Amino acid sequence: MYNGILPVFKDRGLTSHDVVFKLRKILKTKKVGHTGTLDPEVSGVLPICIGSATKVSDYIMEMGKTYKATVSLGITTTTEDQTGEILEQTAVNEQDVSAKSIDDVLQQFKGELIQIPPMYSSVKVNGKKLYEYARNNQVVERPERKVNIYQINRISDLRFVDDTCQFDMIVECGKGTYIRTLATDIGKALGLPAHMSKLTRTQSGGFDINESLTLEDIKSLHEHDTLLEKLFPIEYGLKGIEQILITDNAIKGKILNGQKFYKAEFKQNIDDIVIMVDNETHKVLAIYEPHPEKLDEIKPKKVFN
């Protein structure tokens, strides 16, 4: 039985659930989960949690992501990417846009932004996913969401192809950011129709695309009993959360039994979630959080036993 995190390379054409389904068959276990949906037409790294590591998937999802995207100026589509039908089309040439004007606009999108999710997305409104409304030609009011763009930079020359202007950019962002919506909004800021014509996720949850494994890699490693050495430990998915090292065996036992504690029993000031770590093995024992009612106590959120 495997317990850990695998950075998987998702090919275009597969859904995130397809990857989970295939891995369940390869590894012969149902305890497999992904760390946030990656659209079918997007390739890149998809961290997969296996066994007890499924308990930390929410924390991996909260970590930042990095994308390499191609923006095409001159065309907007129904889906905001290359798969949709054309909504608006304008010929773009070298007199209409420059590298400097694009670079200036990109920096306007750095920081906290308000985004409206695209109609073709899995965001739910009134219990239904937006793409279900879109397929029935229904447009509904979509909730605004705050997203964070930490870095955004053009990384290629401008390419003028078939009356469009294309360029590549790198975007470092927080959870819930729609890059295709960002591409469309960049076009609006330039006064031009735009869409995202290609997208690759290069980093997610602290994992890089260069260390990710294909499904074929994983199948081969599993068959040769060498997959275990490629697994990242559960602790890797909890980076950035304060640790409390536990040396007392009696306290370890209480933690593994899911008992509550008084905050005063620990030296640290506990104002947020913390992870209890075995001082000898450096393995995570549990995740604890402040009690919502008893302010002087902490209670277990997840226990790893």
UniProtKB/Swiss-Prot annotation:
Transmembrane segments: none annotated. One of its GO terms (biological process) is mRNA pseudouridine synthesis. It catalyses: uridine(55) in tRNA = pseudouridine(55) in tRNA. One of its GO terms (molecular function) is RNA binding. Keywords: Isomerase, tRNA processing. Its EC number is 5.4.99.25. InterPro entries: PsdUridine_synth_cat_dom_sf (IPR020103), PsdUridine_synth_N (IPR002501), tRNA_psdUridine_synth_TruB (IPR014780), TruB_C (IPR032819). It is an enzyme of class 5 (isomerase). The active site is at D39. Belongs to the pseudouridine synthase TruB family. Type 1 subfamily. Responsible for synthesis of pseudouridine from uracil-55 in the psi GC loop of transfer RNAs. NCBIfam families: TruB. This is tRNA pseudouridine synthase B. It comes from Staphylococcus saprophyticus subsp. saprophyticus (strain ATCC 15305 / DSM 20229 / NCIMB 8711 / NCTC 7292 / S-41). The lineage of its organism: Bacteria, Bacillati, Bacillota, Bacilli, Bacillales.
